[in-house]
């Protein structure tokens, strides 16, 4: 079992436990950040009102939420389930659950309305990785992993097929502090891309989860200081771009909000990053292009607390 240690430590397999190295700042820049943290500057993000109709005017019929909870038990103690009950999604996808199925908290198993529950966790690594998918409707079919042994040992992917689409929730491997796992991440990216392309050839695809990459400079607060750090290396960004092109998929948030800055989903626990909005957009809803006419809205719930990530929500009119 990997030692928990401090945030920013490296697990035994090299997976990084959430860090966000910052570029060195001048005193002037530091003062600017203080003003922005106080709401006096442009750095804070306000989630606009939900758009619940498609471009053609059809009302939304499906609401999916995704959240990296950074440990189910801690998330529940921090009232994460209260937010879920208020948000009331039709499907809830969770990443970094750090919990085997036989140790799931009772509060989660008894969650009203989301009675079809599917979980995946590493067989030999207690308290590490893990994903969950909870649904109001019973899926036609559910599978786990991407069908390649090298990549299916850490409980990172669940696939659920519904009538009109396939939903994949994923917790993509982190390249690690010092990029100790970058080569593995590149192999994962290639295998994951092949897998998703196969799925998307049969049915429209929705991919959601913590994809552990900020795609463009607009997707993190300090791009210049992080080009050699996990989550923003050229290799990871290129891999993400190739995923969008090859499958193909569209980034639902950027499709609707192409130029909106300061929209992040992850903030390190260190250095008051969240209050200053020094963050990264690592969590996504990616859609087959055939689903774009059904896209009503793609939301970042940045005010929801309970993890070092915030939840994201997708509205579709299917």
Swiss-Prot record:
It is an enzyme of class 3 (hydrolase). The keyword Nucleus applies. Probably binds two magnesium or manganese ions per subunit. The active site is at 171, 210 (proton donor/acceptor). GO terms for cellular component: cytoplasm; endoplasmic reticulum; mitochondrion; nuclear speck; nucleolus; nucleoplasm; nucleus. The record marks 212 as: Transition state stabilizer. Mg(2+) 2 binds at residues 210, 212. A motif (Nuclear export signal (NES)) lies at residues 64-80. Residues 23-33 are annotated as: Necessary for interaction with NPM1 and for efficient rRNA binding. A motif (Nuclear localization signal (NLS)) lies at residues 8-13. Its cofactor is Mg(2+); Mn(2+). One of its GO terms (molecular function) is DNA-(apurinic or apyrimidinic site) endonuclease activity. Residues 1-33 are annotated as: Necessary for interaction with YBX1, binding to RNA, association together with NPM1 to rRNA, endoribonuclease activity on abasic RNA and localization in the nucleoli. Pfam families: Exo_endo_phos. Keywords: Acetylation, Activator, Cleavage on pair of basic residues, Cytoplasm, Disulfide bond, DNA damage, DNA recombination, DNA repair, DNA-binding, Endonuclease, Endoplasmic reticulum, Exonuclease, Hydrolase, Magnesium, Metal-binding, Mitochondrion, Nuclease, Nucleus, Phosphoprotein, Repressor, RNA-binding, S-nitrosylation, Transcription, Transcription regulation, Ubl conjugation. The N-terminus contains the redox activity while the C-terminus exerts the DNA AP-endodeoxyribonuclease activity; both function are independent in their actions. An unconventional mitochondrial targeting sequence (MTS) is harbored within the C-terminus, that appears to be masked by the N-terminal sequence containing the nuclear localization signal (NLS), that probably blocks the interaction between the MTS and Tom proteins. Belongs to the DNA repair enzymes AP/ExoA family. The specific activity of the cleaved mitochondrial endodeoxyribonuclease appears to be about 3-fold higher than of the full-length form. Extract of mitochondria, but not of nuclei or cytosol, cleaves recombinant APEX1 to generate a mitochondrial APEX1-sized product. This is DNA repair nuclease/redox regulator APEX1. It comes from Gorilla gorilla gorilla (Western lowland gorilla). The lineage of its organism: Eukaryota, Metazoa, Chordata, Craniata, Vertebrata.
